Amino acid sequence: MEREDWDRRYGGTELIWTAEPNRFVVEELGDLPAGRALDLGAGEGRNAVWLAERGWRVTAVDFSPVALDKARRLARARGVSVDWALEDLRDYQPEQAAYDLVLAAYLHLLPAGRAAVLGGAVAALARCGTLLVVGHDLANLTEGVGGPQDPAVLYTSKAIVAELDGLTVRRAGRVRRPVDTVAETGGAVDTLVLATRD
């Protein structure tokens, strides 16, 4: 989806997702010592705000000004500071070797765009830094509910790992999470890849 599509989707007064962070973000990153974090495709800011509440110095990037307005409101309501950046990630060049954590959660781009973003994410990691990539898995089309219906933008752990040259993969595979919304009830199948720069 393009910026205008996301602006329309984020246009209501309520958050599309909850204000609570993604469960895999909490499970995988909750024990990391705070440092400098980069949230790529931050949307309404739930993960960035959660990280900031835990002492991280967060830069959160998204291309939807509507989403970032909601994210700023969420951060104010929670009493935390986040550096919000309005950028199209397909063109964004993060500071290199600068972040202890880079997060890309549910950032679904066509393969060339995804490769560019993940290349930038890898370059942005400092020594001993952690990268977490989580998003809808290709298997979600047949085994799960929700998420994009275009196979070209869905993840597999193999495809994500192939973009992480120079990192040590700590975990890569499919994970399941419950989905219970007005529109859908069931489970979603996601890809989760956790990698570090040694």
What residue spans do the PLM features occupy?
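A short acidic, Gly/Pro-enriched loop at the edge of an enzyme's catalytic core
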Residues: Y92-L101
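A short glycine-rich, Lys/Arg-flanked "PGG" loop and its adjoining helix->strand segment in the class I
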Residues: A115-R127
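Conserved SAM/SAH-binding beta-strand->alpha-helix loop
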Residues: S64-V66
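Conserved class I S-adenosyl-L-methionine
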Residues: M1-L32, G35-G43, A139
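Conserved SAM-binding strand-loop segment of SAM-dependent methyltransferases
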Residues: R78-L89
